[in-house]
């Protein structure tokens, strides 16, 4: 996706939502399956346009601690400096455009490489 985010989105952060029990159930199953099969799992939260509210950050923290555990690294990029808040890198508050995705992919690759280096 190319282009910039429409100004209709730039003044309305998304409200914090409760954790969806069905999604949490399947996340738990995914984590259990990966552990059982010896698959190394990393959780990634990609950038959003808006800086998340305290309530939104707490929702991610609770989801992570309740359903994932401390043995799974969490790469939290939701409020990534240089990307979040830059309307030229998003098509809407939740989706980066091609350039935003390119920049984020580079940062994510670096973070993953540092996790998996011996």
Q: What residue spans do the PLM features occupy?
A:
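Acidic-and-aromatic substrate-binding clefts and catalytic sites of carbohydrate-active enzymes
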Residues: 18-23, 49-59
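A short, structure-level motif marking secondary-structure boundaries and short turns
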Residues: 14-16, 48-49, 93
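Secreted/periplasmic serine-hydrolase-like ester/acetyl group-modifying domain
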Residues: 1-37
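Non-transmembrane, interaction-prone segments in cytosolic or luminal domains
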Residues: 19-20, 38, 49, 108, ...
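Active-site segments of SGNH/GDSL-like serine hydrolases
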Residues: 28-56
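C-terminal regions of proteins
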Residues: 54, 59-118
